[in-house]
Amino acid sequence: MSLSRPDFLALCEQHGLGQHADALHRQLRPRIRYHRTDAPDVPPGGSRIGGGPDVPSDFEWPMHNGRALDFLLQLNLADLQGFACAPALPAHGTLAFFYDVQEQPWGFDPADRTGHRVYWFEGVDLQQWDAPDAETAF
């Protein structure tokens, strides 16, 4: 769903934000919203949230402070073509997102740099992996 400018301004007015509507509207950016489905089988490299990531056979699982990062989601970039945000991204390949959900680093501290990772896989055979056991991750 996308709101037209008049609809957005009316919504702001309805919720008591009319005096801020123009400033809020300038902050809007294109976005894509994902919805959970019960799709049984996602092909390798397909878009999905959770589960195990599809990665190359020589992939080294990302770590932070001795712990394996958690896999969040992967996006097939071909699925994003036609959306307003697509020109800012490659037209093909898979993005895989990892994050330390236990420590939840914000990234302000340079020591937090390893607390999140985004990988772009292009033109390689991908296979689904499970997260390493905490005991064998070291």
Task: Label every model-predicted segment.
Residues 1-94:
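An N-terminus-focused feature that recognizes amino-terminal "leader" regions
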Residues 81-138:
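Hydrophobic, ordered structural segments
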